[in-house]
């Protein structure tokens, strides 16, 4: 909301007021004793010489930090590079082993769930696509998510069977060097510094787009974390998942109810109370909050404002009173990673620690 500033307001107070407002909306400013660095130069220095397009990475990240007003620090740069290394080994469009089999399995799964004979789907895939090859031939040679996304876009728009199986929803959900969510990118285009000629989905698969939206997801939100580890977990599990998991742990201590520490404070998309909300309701009398108060304040769990609610403060006060010690305000969520691309037993905590190790090594270079 626009606001007017009195002319007589001292400049120092005005500056502090503006900076405070910016901190609420986006990335945190420089920390005390942190020095700004030249983003492009640091990227060139930190990236392996084997990466052929280091200059393109340097230019894209410099523009990204500038346009998003991200503090240009070595830690922030290394945090972005660490995620990109973990997710793609610095490839803007990384190859996915066995992607053709994964894609065909997903198509067959959709067909079976909709009671469509698989042979009909396979027949539809033999139709010639816009590039002159059949969809089946393109699937046989697909190597990257960018290629697969293009196949599905064509299949959905050109073939009735594609529309029946997928509607208007392309089943490729992430892309680019940081494997950022395409749905996230589509909701956060404000301030994007380059002209988008095609769709946001297509832009995510470019180096500049993948880095810009990935950096936005990683760094462009205010959080009171004392180490980057928790931002890496949030990158995987959603903004504030680490803070919310710590809150769930406090709720569990205060109520005696065992909870999954997944960072989801409400059952999103439903008016029904989820497990965390039900556990908090058991404390309603002690907290002096009604069920509607509890719901309304839990709904702020996707923002920094949640930490200012009576619910957040009172739950931690009660849990600390019962445990006799100060409790952490952030913990790694206990979430099992699920994706057709994942063949091992991996968790959000594993991901966050791996990325943090890469960040630390980057800062040691």
Predicted features by range, described:
Residues 14:
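Substrate-recognition/specificity elements adjacent to catalytic centers across diverse enzyme folds
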Residues 2-3, 17-365:
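Cell-wall glycan-active module
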Residues 1-11:
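Bacterial N-terminal signal peptides that target proteins for export
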